[in-house]
Amino acid sequence: VRVEDGVAWLTLNRPNAANTIDRPLAAAFHKAIVELNDDANVRALVLSGAGKMFCAGGDLQRFAREEDGASAYVEALIADFHAGLALLENFRAPVIAAVHGAAAGAGMGLALTADIVIAAENSRFVMAYTRAGLTPDGGTSWILPHLIGLRRALELTLLNRTLTAAEALDFGMITEIAT
């Protein structure tokens, strides 16, 4: 996290793990959103991902390594991540998601929570939950139908269709494609 000239830059920084969300990242995300929302000097927030992609969703490999099962781990992760998303949705300053590469699962939900979504031409958007045998999370089951309508949201969720940046723009999921 850095703040320059009133603009806060919050970068998901797990590039070697596709910026997937694990407990430490979820906790850091929540803490950062709380602090930035309380900072009167922040007039805008830009969300991005380090490395080759924005965010590939939850860290499923980490979930599977839990000795006592993933349930308690995931519950703690979700508590922090969802609390951060709720604050982000009502953030007192405009939120811009700068998406490149994949925005999958909860990563897609995170991007779509922003007020403005600017995507690189190489961006791809996918729900990814059904491929992993999971139900939608990360706010996607609420925000997606509100942005693009129920029929298209069901298509993306149930068929696990991947959208290009151009298709996401056509669907109304993003604001513009960066050139």
Label each residue range with its predicted role.
Residues 10, 14, 28-29, 47, ...:
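Terminal peptide-recognition signature
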Residues 49-85, 103, 131:
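Glycine- (often His-adjacent) and acidic-residue-rich active-site loop
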